[in-house]
Regions:
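Glycine-centered short loops/turns at secondary-structure junctions
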Residues: 97, 127, 152, 258, ...
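Terminal low-complexity tails and localization/encapsulation signals of metabolic enzymes
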Residues: 1-8, 14, 324-333, 346-350, ...
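Beta-strand-loop-alpha-helix segment that lines the small-molecule cofactor/substrate pocket
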Residues: 75-76, 82-137, 152
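C-terminal glycine/acidic-rich active-site capping loop/insertion
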Residues: 217, 221-246, 250, 254-257, ...
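Glycine- and charged-residue-rich phosphate/anionic-cofactor binding loop of Rossmann-like
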Residues: 35-39, 350-367
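Predominantly a Rossmann-like dinucleotide-binding segment in NAD(P)-dependent oxidoreductases
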Residues: 126-128, 136-242, 297, 381
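Conserved SAM-binding strand-loop segment of SAM-dependent methyltransferases
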Residues: 59-64
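N-terminal Rossmann-like dinucleotide-binding module
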Residues: 1-56
């Protein structure tokens, strides 16, 4: 492996922006990480791409991702495109011997995700690494929650209760951006944000969902066609188009450890901007986390006397907690962007040490299988559907 890791990033939208920040900052705060060279950024619009290159700090820009993957001076390919291109780009990069980190969800369906996982496992035989970018695993408070559960503080797990609530498309005149097109995005709130809480439930408990009963709902059937894109949104142009994905997804789930779960993901929860929350209840206690208070974890110890019962707040800002020592003194909080720096750090250290990064493409495939099962259930009157 070269002393420095030379990175190519495909895509320069919202995720491209935050990934660029992570690549740019990782060496400043994690000195044991390999040195990163932000070599080339790739996208379709030459003018917008060049602006992104300058703004985000990349050395070069290129409009043809196939040329990027063919280059000998690229070690890592970071896939930040829409879901419909993940399979082709990631598999091509892995076959070319490039390490790959790919945004979530891994693909638009389980068939595509299966092909990606197979390619990743084959590439791993040559120490070529791959990881799916579920950044919430890198929130220090959730990492602490995982430690609590693994140490037995919660006892036998009975319930997982997870929500991801947003309101950014509640305006019926919000444009028909690519996230509202099934061909491009695969699904709506289900794949975009429910994927996060499905992965979080697995990350925390170590248990997988085996069956689901779900409902999907699209509240706004038509929207103005989009104009030029800016981050998550876009301007509007003449005409209207059909929304082909869900606005909200709700499902119950059975886990392989005997626990039961409830999951809700919506972009229509007025007043909720990015309220990703998860609660786990066990025989000895409970944890609760809400990303809108991302530096805090609530913990209830049910082994205490009832006169002392109740949730207590744990500040995840102490240097002894995962990732925190790299940043600021205790009590100085971190934010959303730091979780991406943490995942980039873990990924490049796995390359350096020849270890297996997590979550793997197999983990991403598992999440995609759950998403597909929810869609299948919703299309069959919420019939209980096995995750296969």
């Amino acid at each position: 492996m070269a002393q420095n890791l030379r990175v190519a990033m495909i895509g320069y939208g919202f995720m491209g922006k935050v990934h660029s920040h992570a690549w740019r900052s990782v060496n400043h705060f994690f000195p044991d990480a390999p040195q990163i060279e932000m070599t080339v950024i790739c996208g379709r619009s030459k003018e917008a791409l060049e602006n992104a290159r300058i703004t985000f700090g990349w050395k070069e820009s290129e409009t043809d991702w196939k040329k990027v993957i063919a280059r000998d001076d690229i070690d890592i390919v970071d896939v930040c495109t829409a879901g419909d291109s993940h399979e082709e780009i990631a598999i091509s990069a892995l076959k070319a011997g490039k390490h790959v980190i790919c945004e979530k969800p891994l693909a638009n369906n389980a068939s595509e995700a299966t092909a990606m996982a197979q390619a990743a496992n084959e590439a791993a035989k040559k120490s070529t690494k791959s990881m799916v970018a579920f950044n919430y695993r890198r929130v220090p408070a959730l990492a602490v929650a995982k430690q609590f559960i693994e140490s037995g503080k919660l006892g036998t797990i009975y319930h997982v209760r997870a929500n991801y609530l947003q309101d950014w498309i509640i305006d019926p005149e919000f444009p028909l951006v690519w996230r509202l097109d099934k061909k491009t995005a695969g699904s709506g709130a289900l794949g975009d944000i429910a994927a996060h809480i499905i992965d979080a439930s697995y990350f925390l408990t170590g248990s997988k969902i085996t069956s689901v009963s779900g409902q999907l709902k699209t509240f706004i059937k038509e929207r103005p066609l989009p104009g030029a894109y800016t981050g998550l949104t876009a301007g509007t142009s003449a005409g209207r188009g059909t929304v082909t994905v869900d606005d909200t997804a709700v499902f119950t789930a059975n886990f392989d450890n005997g626990a039961i779960g409830t999951f809700e993901a919506t972009r229509f929860a007025a007043g909720r901007k990015n309220a990703m929350s998860i609660e786990v209840n066990g025989s000895k206690g409970s944890i609760y986390f809400n990303f809108e208070d991302m530096n805090e974890l609530l913990f209830h110890d049910h082994t205490h006397a009832s006169s002392e019962a109740g949730f207590r707040k744990i500040l995840a800002t102490d240097g002894a907690q995962p990732y925190v020592a790299a940043w600021w003194p205790p009590g100085h909080i971190i934010g959303y962007e730091h979780t991406f720096t943490h995942e980039i750090y873990d990924f490049v250290v796995s390359i350096k040490n020849d270890t297996n990064p997590s979550p793997s493409f197999d983990d991403g495939l598992y999440v995609q299988k759950v998403l597909d099962a929810v869609e299948s259930s919703a299309g069959n009157n919420s019939q209980l559907t096995q995750v296969k």
